[in-house]
Amino acid sequence: MSLTPVTVAVTGAAGQIGYSLLFRIAHGDMLGRQRPVRLRLLEIPSALPALEGTVMELQDCAFPLLADVEIGSDPREVFDGAQLALLVGARPRTKGMERGDLLEANGAIFTEQGRALNDVADHDVRVVVTGNPANTNALIAQRNAPDIPASRFSALTRLDHNRAVAMLAAQTGASVDDVKHLSVWGNHSATQYPDLDHARVAGRPALDLVSREWVQDTFIPTVAKRGAAILEARGASSAASAANATIDHARDLMLGNHRGDWTSMSVVSDGSYGVPEGLVSSFPVTTSGGDWSIVQGLDISEFSRARIDASVAELESERAAVQELGLI
């Protein structure tokens, strides 16, 4: 195969999301069916035996695009030469853990990983954060990698975007492919704002097809609380859908999103739409060749402004908390 393999690092590789993710990467779902990949997989030492089992399965699939797999527990070894880093692993919130405890536990992880990426990753690396709290984990990693441009870091709100697209399509009797120009703003949390003001379904304004009451009373809260509903139903958090969204996010970032549409991605704000500069917040973006651009010139309604501001306020609170902990 003539194309040079891309080195992809994945953290938390033995977890449920990792298990759903790795086979699709090796199959070519993320970087295309012509591009070989080298997988570099990071786990904590106690999870390495399980990860070895996953590697055996990857080998047994005989994927033509899988050039090589290496595993380890040292981010400086795993990230060496990485061109795309998918930071999936994170400390989950456990019973009795306060929000500040969660930020502190993940802060240590993403501080170390940010520094390692800064020191050993490829000079043109792209970093995608899936592990929650994704926005603030991305901020911590980015601030601890001063030699990597901030625009190279992004965090996952594609799962929220996909949930919103699917729900709007179901409500209007349309295909998901018919839904365009939907936006998710703010934090990947219950304060996120899935915005239909500019969305279209088969060319028609979405708000001509659904009621404001449905949007406010059903659509927004259902999308925001979907993760909790899945956790309650299956006894475990979203894994396959989170992996799928990570694939979608990274594919669009590296290969470009669909023409004539945009997607949602948490990126380092440049001050657009009143979101404080430097904050990692979700915006509508277009993507091409590893770069993203925030969609400009959208009219923001009074209702939308209030929802965006509320989510941004939560992000500012998280940033203040990690600043207080000395993580950024």
Swiss-Prot record:
Assigned EC number: 1.1.1.37
Domain of life: Bacteria
Binding site for substrate: 93, 99, 132, 163
Active site: 188
InterPro entries: L-lactate/malate_DH, Lactate/malate_DH_C, Lactate/malate_DH_N, Lactate_DH/Glyco_Ohase_4_C, Malate_DH_AS, Malate_DH_type2, NAD(P)-bd_dom_sf
CDD domains tied to this protein: MDH_chloroplast-like
Pfam family for this entry, one: Ldh_1_C
SUPFAM superfamilies according to UniProt: LDH C-terminal domain-like (SSF56327), NAD(P)-binding Rossmann-fold domains (SSF51735)
GO terms of biological process kind: malate metabolic process; tricarboxylic acid cycle
GO molecular function: L-malate dehydrogenase (NAD+) activity
UniProtKB keywords: NAD, Oxidoreductase, Tricarboxylic acid cycle
Binding of NAD(+), residues: 12-18, 106, 113, 130-132
Reaction catalyzed: (S)-malate + NAD(+) = oxaloacetate + NADH + H(+)
Function: Catalyzes the reversible oxidation of malate to oxaloacetate.
Family, similarity comment: Belongs to the LDH/MDH superfamily. MDH type 2 family.
Name assigned to this protein: Malate dehydrogenase
Organism: Kocuria rhizophila (strain ATCC 9341 / DSM 348 / NBRC 103217 / DC2201)
